């Protein structure tokens, strides 16, 4: 059978692209190396609770068109992301706001908070930050940095803040209002019943092959110039590849760096409410995990049991899941070299977090996929 597109990866980018192309009468086949669709936004039910299998995913956007788009796929609840940070048995509200400062310094007014932060910054006299530590200190002062930034960041990156480049933290949002809403976007929520159903709706009527890797499934027929399945049954005019761009090119220019995560999920039977919040960050270096997620709170659950997940950052090695691109100068230059190779491809498109080696929020993934569909039509 002949398909216009082979879509490699059934995550959000691939699913939106395949869905839109199918609506336009293009024939798409989707392959996915995992045993499930939805990529890292995959959710599954346990004890009546939707489990965010690959870490917390909270949908938020300022893009009204994208918000309207996702609301055609699922009904969203009114969840607001308001994480809490735990530091040496003290709890602080995030993002940094008046609730945080009132707890930290026993103050009440924005004027007092601003004076406290400015006083600490002035004392340090950092003119030109040379590393992440100096950058963070020059933005928020000593107390916030030591208690809420340093340990968490070092766990995330596996390196001391003095060894990390300053650009990783371009800004640290500091709000002088009593407001624990983490995001500034006007639209926010979580699809009722989880994200997997949303992606299922996108892929409705489209053939999806699970447990199928690109390397094992597809080859290029040098005579016809077309891509085909290794059994010769299917041919494809074009490929949308949402896997790792360096892997597509067999690492011929070198390996890009990623950070990975390990998740430890525990069912707590008979415990109705473990921590009272969906996300609690652990900001001291000595605690090995960065956060604990209690999944039921994403959907205001009242189940008699609860499920928690501890999140451990780790170095990435081949065979592990790559979660975050390490966008330092070295890796950015290497990605640009791969992007130059990609530009020469007539019939291969690269999309998503791994295909474009960038950290993408979900709304930006959808916008980028919709833009790619438009570009394809214009071509």
Ranges and model annotations:
Residues 3, 25, 206, 236-237, ...:
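Short, well-ordered alpha-helix to beta-strand connector turns
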Residues 3-30, 373:
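N-terminal Rossmann-like FAD-binding beta1-loop-alpha1 element of flavoenzymes
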Residues 6-8, 31, 233-246:
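Short hydrophobic core segments
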Residues 19, 23, 43, 204, ...:
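Short, well-ordered alpha-helices that flank and scaffold nucleotide-derived cofactor binding pockets
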Residues 19-47:
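Glycine-rich FAD pyrophosphate-binding loop
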Residues 47-123:
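Dinucleotide-binding Rossmann-like beta1-alpha1 core, especially the glycine-rich loop
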Residues 88-92, 99-236:
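Active-site/ligand-binding neighborhood in enzyme catalytic cores
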Residues 237, 247-379:
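C-terminal segments that line or cap access tunnels to active or ligand-binding sites in enzymes
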């Amino acid at each position: 059978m002949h398909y216009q597109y082979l879509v490699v990866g059934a995550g959000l980018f691939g699913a939106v692209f395949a869905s839109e192309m199918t609506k336009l009468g293009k024939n798409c086949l989707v392959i996915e190396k995992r045993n499930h669709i939805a990529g890292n936004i995959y959710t599954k039910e346990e004890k009546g609770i939707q489990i965010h299998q690959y870490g917390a995913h909270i949908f938020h956007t300022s893009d009204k068109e994208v918000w309207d788009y996702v609301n055609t796929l699922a009904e969203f609840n009114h969840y607001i992301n308001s994480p809490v940070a735990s530091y040496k048995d003290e709890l602080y509200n995030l993002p940094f706001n008046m609730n945080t400062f009132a707890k930290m310094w026993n103050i009440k007014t924005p004027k007092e908070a601003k004076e406290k932060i400015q006083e600490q910054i002035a004392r340090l006299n950092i003119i030109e930050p040379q590393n992440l530590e100096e950058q963070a200190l020059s933005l928020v002062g000593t107390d916030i940095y030591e208690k809420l930034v340093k340990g968490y960041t070092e766990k995330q990156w596996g390196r001391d803040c003095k060894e990390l480049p300053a650009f990783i933290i371009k800004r640290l949002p500091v709000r002088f209002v009593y407001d624990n809403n983490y995001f500034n976007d006007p639209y926010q929520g979580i699809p009722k019943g989880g994200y997997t159903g949303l992606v299922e709706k996108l892929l409705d009527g489209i053939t999806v092959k699970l447990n199928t890797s690109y390397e094992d499934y597809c080859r290029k027929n040098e005579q016809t110039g077309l891509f085909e399945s290794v059994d010769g049954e299917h041919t494809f005019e074009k490929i949308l590849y949402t896997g790792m761009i360096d892997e597509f090119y067999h690492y011929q220019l070198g390996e890009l760096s990623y950070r990975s995560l390990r998740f430890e999920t525990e069912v707590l039977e008979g415990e109705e409410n473990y921590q009272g919040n969906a996300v609690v960050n652990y900001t001291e270096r000595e605690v090995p995990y960065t956060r604990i997620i209690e999944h039921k709170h994403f959907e205001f659950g009242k189940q008699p049991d609860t499920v928690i997940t501890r999140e451990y950052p780790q170095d990435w090695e081949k065979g592990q899941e790559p979660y975050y691109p390490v966008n330092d100068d070295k890796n950015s230059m290497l990605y640009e070299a791969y992007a130059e190779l990609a530009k020469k491809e007539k019939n291969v498109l690269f999309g998503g977090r791994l295909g474009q080696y960038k950290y993408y929020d979900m709304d930006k993934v959808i916008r980028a996929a919709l833009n790619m569909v438009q570009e394809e039509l214009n071509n």
